[in-house]
Regions:
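Internal alpha-helical scaffold of NAD(P)-dependent oxidoreductase catalytic cores
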Residues: 102-111, 127-164
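NAD(P)+-binding Rossmann beta1-loop-alpha1 motif at the extreme N-terminus of oxidoreductases
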Residues: 1-56, 125
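Short alpha-helical
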Residues: 14, 41-42, 74-75, 98, ...
Length: 164
């Protein structure tokens, strides 16, 4: 089962660190289940110290069953342009203001969960809103489990007027 849960991450900033530290710390994922791509050597060093594979090539993260998009919304277009034409796995986006429609249009991804964690995730006391309505039951369960590792989770339905 662990091999099916391989998680690729693009973006190794604060929220990615909090989420992955929680998932590893709670035993939801092992460090060997994860690969993180980040252009910053310091970020890669942080993850390598956790035992996580860390690379600078975003394409390596696409080889996983799940992809956590943890980049700043303003840099998403650069990442999407770089990966245009690639096959995307199930996407979990923590980018504020980027709709599933926009992510799909930019990447071609067909299965996307939008997630909005908050800063207390870094100490395991977060509250995360999850819209996993595009995912099947197993993938939705994975997303919920991932964010339960860093706090409480509330499932939300997609509403056009809500911009997570």
């Amino acid at each position: 089962m662990k091999n099916q849960r391989m998680l690729g991450v693009i973006g190794g900033g604060f929220m990615a660190r909090a989420i992955l530290s929680g998932a590893i710390g709670k035993g939801m994922l092992s460090a060997e289940d994860i690969i993180v791509s980040d252009p910053d050597a310091g970020s890669r060093d942080y993850f390598e110290n956790l035992g996580v594979a860390a690379v600078s090539d975003n394409r390596r993260a696409l080889a996983c069953k799940y992809l956590l998009l943890a980049v700043k919304p303003q840099t998403f277009s650069l990442v999407a342009d770089e990966l245009k034409g690639e096959h995307f796995p199930i996407v979990i986006s923590i980018m504020a203001g980027k709709t599933k429609k926009a992510i799909s249009a930019a990447t071609g991804a067909g299965k996307i969960a939008r997630v909005m964690p908050n800063l207390p995730c870094s100490i395991g006391c977060g509250m995360t809103a999850v819209d996993a309505t595009m995912l099947d039951a197993d993938a939705g369960h994975f997303v919920l489990e991932l964010f339960h590792a860093v706090g409480e989770v509330i499932e939300v339905a997609p509403l056009p007027e809500i911009r997570l």
